[in-house]
């Protein structure tokens, strides 16, 4: 694993809001990730989240039908698959996330297997953290390419520098370009950057980075594994997102999200 970051890489990440690390996984590691992620997805069957009544009503399940049309999306695989858990709990990944954001520690917010199916439509522009249950400038996501990610099969696009603020979120079902109508200042930023990657490469992006993904115009599925991290010490903002029902109901706005059974600490300098 290519897990050593240079000062230049950290500076680039903080300026642009994202970074691509080529050949993050070596050949053997890539095959291991492909197998273990694939097995975890297969064992989950048709369930986006762990098969537990405590997840009924979560935002992820509300959008299950819409997502199914173009994504095979499976979340929180670490909760019910030990081989995968060992991959995503790798302290080296957590340290990279903490170093890029300059925080003392990170917890898992959500992992997601994102398999963009053949001929699937685009993924609209969005920011991650405004959808989540905490407000933080230092949320961060790793996106690992299990297949080559190309302009033709659904690579990510990042708008450099867009991680400096939150933007108005378009109403569900509105056109892809609606975010630019609501937030014309985005048009003043550099043009979207296509994050093409060879299999085994990865990107990190800040939780406020405006990003999306192109359509898959090929007959093959494009596989990726992602994980969003929140800074240790983050507090609850009142949104449910993917929190289990019982835990969600136990929280008050401002409570620290430090339940290791829901948001495990994967790296800390302390």
Q: Where are the model-predicted features located?
A:
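Short, structured patches in soluble enzyme cores that scaffold and shape functional sites
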Residues: 110-112, 127-129, 144-148, 160, ...
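Active-site region of the double-stranded beta-helix
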Residues: 103-104, 129-135, 145-155, 163
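Non-heme Fe(II)-dependent double-stranded beta-helix
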Residues: 1-15, 22-125, 131, 240, ...
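Double-stranded beta-helix
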Residues: 11, 149-210, 234, 254
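Short, conserved beta-strand element in jelly-roll/cupin
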Residues: 133-151, 196, 204, 228-232
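A short secondary-structure junction signal
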Residues: 121-127, 136, 152-158, 167-171, ...
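A short beta-loop-beta micro-motif enriched in histidine and acidic residues
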Residues: 101, 128-139, 190-191, 197, ...
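Non-heme Fe(II)/2-oxoglutarate
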Residues: 43, 47-50, 60, 172, ...
């Amino acid at each position: 694993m290519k897990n050593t970051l240079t000062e230049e890489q950290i500076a680039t990440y903080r300026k642009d809001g994202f970074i691509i690390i080529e050949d993050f996984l070596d050949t053997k590691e890539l095959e291991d990730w492909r197998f273990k992620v694939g097995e975890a997805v297969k064992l989950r069957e048709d369930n986006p989240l762990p098969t537990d009544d405590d997840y009924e009503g979560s935002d992820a399940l509300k959008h299950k039908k819409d997502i199914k049309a173009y994504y095979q999306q499976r979340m929180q695989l670490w909760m019910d698959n030990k081989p995968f858990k060992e991959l995503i709990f790798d302290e080296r990944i957590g340290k990279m996330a903490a170093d890029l954001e300059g925080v003392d520690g990170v917890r898992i917010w959500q992992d997601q297997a994102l398999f963009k199916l053949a001929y699937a439509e685009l993924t609209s522009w969005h920011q991650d953290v405004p959808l989540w249950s905490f407000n933080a400038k230092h949320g961060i996501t790793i996106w690992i390419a299990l297949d080559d990610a190309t302009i033709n099969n659904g690579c990510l696009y990042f708008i450099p520098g867009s991680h400096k603020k939150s933007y108005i979120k378009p109403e569900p079902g509105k056109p892809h370009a609606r975010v630019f109508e609501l937030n014309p200042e985005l048009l003043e930023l550099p043009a979207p950057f296509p994050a093409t990657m060879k299999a085994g490469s990865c990107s990190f992006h800040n939780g406020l980075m405006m990003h999306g993904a192109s359509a898959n115009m090929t007959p093959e599925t494009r596989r990726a594994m992602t994980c969003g991290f929140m800074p240790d010490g983050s507090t609850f903002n009142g949104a449910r997102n993917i929190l289990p029902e019982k835990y969600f109901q136990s929280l008050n706005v401002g409570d620290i999200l430090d339940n290791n059974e829901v948001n495990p600490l994967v790296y800390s300098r302390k």
